[in-house]
UniProtKB/Swiss-Prot annotation:
Entry-linked PANTHER family: 3-KETO-L-GULONATE-6-PHOSPHATE DECARBOXYLASE SGBH-RELATED
InterPro entries registered for this protein in UniProt: 3-keto-L-gulonate6Pdecase_UlaD (IPR023942), Aldolase_TIM (IPR013785), HPS/KGPDC (IPR041710), OMPdeCOase_dom (IPR001754), RibuloseP-bd_barrel (IPR011060)
Keyword Lyase: yes
Protein's name according to its UniProt entry: 3-keto-L-gulonate-6-phosphate decarboxylase UlaD
Organism in which the protein naturally occurs: Shigella dysenteriae serotype 1 (strain Sd197)
Site keyed Transition state stabilizer: positions: 64, 67
Quaternary organization: Homodimer.
Coiled-coil intervals: none
Cofactor needs: Mg(2+)
Cofactor comment: Binds 1 Mg(2+) ion per subunit.
Gene expressing this chain: ulaD
Molecular function in Gene Ontology: 3-dehydro-L-gulonate-6-phosphate decarboxylase activity; magnesium ion binding; orotidine-5'-phosphate decarboxylase activity
Amino acid sequence: MSLPMLQVALDNQTMDSAYETTRLIAEEVDIIEVGTILCVGEGVRAVRDLKALYPHKIVLADAKIADAGKILSRMCFEANADWVTVICCADINTAKGALDVAKEFNGDVQIELTGYWTWEQAQQWRDAGIGQVVYHRSRDAQAAGVAWGGADITAIKRLSDMGFKVTVTGGLALEDLPLFKGIPIHVFIAGRSIRDAASPVEAARQFKRSIAELWG
């Protein structure tokens, strides 16, 4: 089983704020996510600028595309994104359109599982050639005190068994990682637990060490 990658979510409102994080920890992570908040705040230039600074890193545009899949994904890929996200409630043709464009750029599409979705939809995504999903505990759910539970682990295992590469996100803390041991997680996303740590560098390194211990 390969080691899960570590992704930092830049859900900053400005590039200046995002750079405060990347200057410290860009070299400690595998994937740099231009979070939805940053996408809205700064547009696709955020993707372009971060990829120019870190060409050796995977840069994800977390656009959560809901419609106009070809247009929006092309905007992201022309800004040199490696991956883009499509929200799970989008029509299957939106996801297909985004994937078609991704292939032109040797990129990839992730389905963001935020909110309601069904296993029938999951099968449609696989049938369409989608290979990545993001299992997401929402920011608002976290704020309401919703913790990771057995239902989450069962769903993640089932998605993996379907052939998806699964990314896990949603207020992920270091102590949560053992919950997922034994599952071939593709990526763990850490946002505030790294960005807001007293030492973001050490926080990122702790995540990497724990991943190596649990999946190595």
